[in-house]
Amino acid sequence: MRSDIIKEGPERAPNRSLLKATGVTDSEMRKPFIAVVNSWNDIIPGHIHLNKLAEAVKAGIRNAGGVPFEFHTIGVCDGIAMGHEGMKYSLPSREVIEDTIELMVKAHQFDGIVLIPTCDKIVPGHLMAAGRLDIPAIVVTGGPMLPGYVDDKYTDLISVFEGVGAYSTGKLSERDLKRLENLSCGGAGSCAGMFTANTMACVTEALGLSLPGCATAHAVDAKKARIAKESGERIVEMVKENLTPRKIVTFKSFENAIMVDMAVGGSTNTTLHLPALAHEFGLNLPLEKFDELSRETPHLISLRPGGPNFMLHFDRAGGVQAVMQRLSSKLHLDQLTVNGKTIGENLNEFEIINPKLNKEIIATLEKPIHAEGGIAVLKGNLAPNGSVVKQAAVDPKMRVHTGPAKVYDCEEDAMENILAGNVKPGDIVVIRYEGPKGGPGMREMLAATAAIGGMGLLESVALVTDGRFSGGTRGPCIGHISPEASEGGPIALVKDGDMIEINIPERVLNLKVSEEELEQRKAAFVPPKKEVTGYLARYQRSVHSANTGGIVD
C-alpha cells in the first residue's frame, strides 16, 4: 500500500506515534488509509450538508475495512459571488482546490480518495486533482436542492435573478420579488436546474467517476446517503484492485461526457472545465470537439434554464443513466466506471422506475427536442479562436441576428445601463475586459443576462463577452470570446454602433467592420491597466485562454 511509506518499519516509529495521537490503532495501521476530501462549509447551500455525507462515506470505508481521514477544501458559491468583485475569485478557485488536494494527499501518502464536492468550480477542482494524482478515487457529488414553489409554479435561483430585472421595469412588485427571494431556494443542494454544478455532476457520472445515479440524487434524498456509504465501501475495493482514474477515464470517456452534456443542455462552463480536466489526464480536448459532437448529438431533455423541467423531474425520470440509455447507440459502451463495470454493463442493469415520466420528459433520438446538442461553438473575425453559446436556451427568433453594439468595459457598467433602460430591442451588448487575464478571473455575466431576461428582452437583445456565463443563463448570450480583449483580441476593437452578425446555425460571429478599419483600430489600441494584487495577480500572470480551458501553469 502507498501508505506503508508512513507506517512500516522501525524508522517510521515517529510517524506512527503521530498517527496514534489521532487515535489510530496498531490493527488499523495494516488497513488502507483513505482520504475523505470534503468541501463542506456553512455559506454555500450546495455544501451545508456535506458533513453528513462525509460521515456516510466514512462509515462505508470502515464497513469495507479501511481507515478514513477527513480533510476539507475551500469552496466559492457562484450565486453569492455573482454581480460584484467576488466573482473574480470563482474560476481561480478551481486550481487552488486542485492544488490543496494534491498537497494533502501527497504529503500524507493516502491509498485512495473519496471526493465530496457539489458546486460549480469545486467539482472540476476535485476531478482535476483526481486526474493529477492518479490514485484510486471516487466522487460523491452533493446533489441538487429541491425547487421552490411560488404562484403555483416551480422556481429556482434564476427566477430570483430574473425577478430583479422584472422589478426594475415595474413588472414585478417588491412584495412579489421578496416572495421569490424567500421561497425559491429550497435548502441544501446545488441550484435546482441544469446549471453548472448539476451539469458537472452529470459529466462526472458520464465519465465513470461516480456511481450510477449519483448525479441527480438530491441532497435531501436518502438515496444520496446510501450512494455516499456505497462509495466509501467501493473505494476500499478500488485500492485493492489498484483501479485508478487514468484506467477509467480515456479520450472516449470524454466523448461520452460531452455527448451527455449536449443531450441534457448543460452549461457552457463545461467547455472550460473538461479541457482543463483532460489536461490533467494527459489528454488534449480541443474546443472544436464540443461542436463536432453537438452536431451529432441531439438535445433530449428540456431542463431549466432552457426549459420547464427541474432536476427533480430529471431524477425521477431516471437521471444520467436514462439519458445514456437513449444515447447508447452513440456512446462508447466499453468504457470502465468506478464500480468496476463498463458503461454498457451499467446500462444493462439500469431499471426505469417511473416509465411514464421517463417517456414524457426524455425525448428519443428519433424525436429529439432539438436536432443538435445544447452548446454551439461560433467563430469569425470577432472570435477567431472560438466562442460558445448554449443554443438550446436561445429563442428561435434570435438564432440569426445582426444588430448594433452597445460596448461596456466591465460588467458593472453594463448592468447599470441595462437597468437604466439604455439597452433597446435589437442591440447587442458587448462586455469586455472580463476574460481570464482581463478580469482577471473571467466573471460570469448572470446578473446582466438575467436582468435582460427579466425585462423581457431575450427575444430582441443579445450579449457577447470575453467573460463567461452561469449555467443558469438563457438567451442569445455568447461567451468565452477568444482571444480576449486584454490580449488584443478583436472584441477590444469594437465601438458603439458597430454592427455584429450572429448566426448560430452557421456557427458565425462576425464584426461587420472592414479589415482596413480594424487594422487602424488595432494600431491605436492600448489595453487598459488594472491594479491587481494577491492571488489574482499570480493568476493573471499564469492563466491561459478560455478556448484551452483557462488552465494555469
Curated annotation (Swiss-Prot):
Pfam families named in the record: ILV_EDD_C (PF24877), ILVD_EDD_N (PF00920)
Signal peptide residues on this chain, from the entry's feature table: none
Co-factor remark: Binds 1 [2Fe-2S] cluster per subunit. This cluster acts as a Lewis acid cofactor.
Catalytic residues (UniProt): 470
Pathway note: Amino-acid biosynthesis; L-isoleucine biosynthesis; L-isoleucine from 2-oxobutanoate: step 3/4; Amino-acid biosynthesis; L-valine biosynthesis; L-valine from pyruvate: step 3/4
PANTHER family: D-XYLONATE DEHYDRATASE, D-XYLONATE DEHYDRATASE YAGF-RELATED
Described purpose of this protein according to its UniProt entry: Functions in the biosynthesis of branched-chain amino acids. Catalyzes the dehydration of (2R,3R)-2,3-dihydroxy-3-methylpentanoate (2,3-dihydroxy-3-methylvalerate) into 2-oxo-3-methylpentanoate (2-oxo-3-methylvalerate) and of (2R)-2,3-dihydroxy-3-methylbutanoate (2,3-dihydroxyisovalerate) into 2-oxo-3-methylbutanoate (2-oxoisovalerate), the penultimate precursor to L-isoleucine and L-valine, respectively.
Quaternary structure and interacting proteins, as annotated: Homodimer.
Protein name, entry field: Dihydroxy-acid dehydratase
Organism name: Methanosarcina barkeri (strain Fusaro / DSM 804)
